[in-house]
Amino acid sequence: MKIAIIGAGIIGVTTAYELAADGHEVTVFERHAAAAEEASFATAGMVAPGSVTPWAAPGMPAKVLRSLLSRHAAVRIGRPLSAGDLAWIWKWRRACKLETYLANRARLQRLAFYSSERLRQLSADLPLEYERSEGYLMLLRSGKDLQLAQPALQVIRDAGVAFREIDAAEARRIEPALNADTALAGAIHLPRDEVGNCRQFAMGLKIGAQLLGARFLSNTTVTRIGRSVPATLYVAGEARRRRFDALVLCAGVASASLLKPLGLSVPIAPVYGYSISAHIREPLNAPLSAVMDERYQVAITRLGQRVRVAGGAEIGGAPGHKRAASLQTLYKVLHDWFPGAAQLSNGVQEWKGARPMLPDGPPVLGASGVPGLWLNIGHGASGWALSCGSARVVADLIAGRAPAIDLEGLGVERLLR
């Protein structure tokens, strides 16, 4: 089939590869000059399927309210809040019920573990270099942090993930550069989870897709999707519509505005995350793989010759404005654990990305209800961890094959009830 993909983030690129590998004629439309320029650009890089859970969870509304009083809050409310932001927050709050959370957690983890398997298969089959390393530590500063981490540990246990609860001495043996002056009560070691550069993987897989015949059209903005059969789309600056046998929407936050004229109201909201990336100044002072500070919900990862520090969740506010306090938290956590590791006097990349999040957590995969239009949207902060599996699922559905996992609750009908 002749298939168009809208969006060349990690979701669009993996989808392009899987469809091209299936023998389809694939064209990818990307509004930026290169792939993975938005939410996929400077992520933490964690691929930890056992830790992929809905943000909508019991107790989270109260936790968010308490965190707003902290200077280094993991969750922040930006200004201004639009009507859409307020509606999203209301739906998110409703999804925090225990029954809803458990169902969505099961859906996410089915997809996350399958995606991890698919990522490993692609890495074995293709010459992809993406600064990969294995294993990470969840750092617990105090006994209270260990107590607060118990719900997350139970999730990991339930998922059957291999992990060890270790003391501070063992944690420092695994990551020798951890600052001895920062209090550490213990840690959780997850040896099989991995870290990798999401954008670098996307760029490498894009080449793989191109070798299979996929075309990538950069600086090309899709302004509208038609309802006609065969499927059609309209590109900015072009008077004539383009026709395809099928369209796959992978446009992140922009997906909602493209779907609305078709009668599909999909509540995707940008939940902003932050990261800083800096060159390593002294390798002996840098992490070997990755750590997660559980108190501040900040990840520190080693990506080749750089250190990346990522965290935060910000609802509302202006897309182009970087909140100074959010960035300061990242610098603080880096200094707490790995002082002197990074060259911070110049060349630091500070990034704010809009993660396309649905209120209840899981993405939407599969048929849209509009003839010829397929969806691969709403992966939130887990796009990197879910991308390879989501792409394979959508390719299988388009081909009329049964996917390898149960897709209950991952279709668009979940949002239209």
Region locations from a protein language model:
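N-terminal Rossmann-like FAD-binding beta1-loop-alpha1 element of flavoenzymes
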Residues: 2-28
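Glycine-rich FAD pyrophosphate-binding loop
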Residues: 21-41
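Dinucleotide-binding Rossmann-like beta1-alpha1 core, especially the glycine-rich loop
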Residues: 42-168
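Active-site substrate-recognition segment that forms the wall
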Residues: 45-46, 51, 55-94, 222-232, ...
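Short beta-strand to alpha-helix junction loop
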Residues: 103-116, 138-148, 188-207, 321-329, ...
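Helical element adjacent to the flavin cofactor pocket in flavoenzyme catalytic cores
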Residues: 147-159, 181-245
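C-terminal catalytic lobe of FAD-dependent flavoproteins
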Residues: 163, 192, 294-295, 335-417
